[in-house]
Amino acid sequence: MRRPSHTAIGTWSGGRYLHFGEPVAPERLEALLRPGDGIDTLLTADAYGSGQADELLGRALAGVERADFSIVGAIGHDFYVGQRDGPRGFPRFTDPALRGPDAYAEYVRMATERSLERLGIDAFDVLLLHNPDRTGYTSEVVWDALRAVRDEGLAHSLGVAPGPANGFTLDVIDCLERFGELIDWAMVILNPLEPWPGELCLAAAREHDVDVITRVVDYGGMFWDDVRPGHDFAPKDHRLFRAKGWVEAGVQRLERLRPIAERHGLTPMQLAAQWCLAHEPVACVVPTLIQEPGGRSIEDKRAELAATPAEILLVADEVAAIRAIGDNTGSMALKGAGPDHEGDARPDRWGLDERLEEVARRWGIEPERDLRQLTAARG
């Protein structure tokens, strides 16, 4: 097993499998993902490109000694039997329209084995449950199935990756309380301009000895410093779903952060990574490398990420000052369990029950204060 390093790249970089920036040629993305030159941890999910991202990463890994890289995989969306629902993507494998609990173990084993086959490796260093629904967070059957693939050597450690949108705070904490003895990793959204709600689950991660991977560290590409007011986004770019004015507001806050970065000889992206890593349970950051039209090359961004110091340079007062500048509390409607959900549960949103209300009390979270959209979205 090779433990994930402090910086990593995911197969969603380069715009081929998720719509961020210009899609790069497959050969270029393979070169970007090939371990070496300061980056040896790679993340993938089997649903990206319905397995194509796995296959491309497998080509990037060809000929590299297995001991020289760490692979974090993710399973959860059933693209084998499930039908894609437009922008919502493929259903979770726990969707009752696809199968019941008696078939969860078979699916988890199949999905894990096929992903490994596409990658050309024997085992994941970390295997994440990808974007679970309420069942995924709470079902002993699901986690027994994950335990089985770990115990059989198909994965060295397990974790949970909420998403795709922001939220799921109480669900992640509840999952750690239920299955903490199985869970070594969690992946959450966190960056200096989005400290909320990700920071709310970090104390529980620390308590349960769970290491955290943070994604969206680049804040939609802004910390790469080539997204400015008037930026030309492609018609299908995911960032078009962000609130109007997010670029302008973000750039204003970025400029307030720049002196802190310069004080330590860091780029804005390296500052964002350092800020995340300064939170005790955070062990790995995985920003998205985006090829902006007319912007810096993703190869240049990779080199910048690789040069991020592992040693934490920021002091506590700087971490707090950065948080205050980027404070986004209440700026968006969150996914997962929330006090403002009405009606039946959906795959990515549901109401609070007594157990989750008790979880909130234990961790000092007031749902009406901490998990509601309170202000107009800033992006």
Residue ranges and their predicted role:
Residues G36, D40, A203-G379:
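Structured C-terminal cap/extension of enzyme domains
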Residues M1-G73, H77-F79, W363, P367-G379:
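N-terminal binding-site loop/beta-alpha segment at the start of enzyme catalytic domains
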Residues W12-G14, A47, A74-D78, L129-R134, ...:
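Active-site beta-loop-alpha junctions enriched in small/polar residues
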Residues L18-V24, R34, R88-N191:
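Glycine/proline-rich, positively charged
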Residues I9, L42, L57, I71, ...:
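Conserved, mostly hydrophobic/aromatic
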Residues R2-T7, G38-T41, E65-F69, I121-D125, ...:
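Short, well-ordered coil/turn segments that N-cap beta-strands
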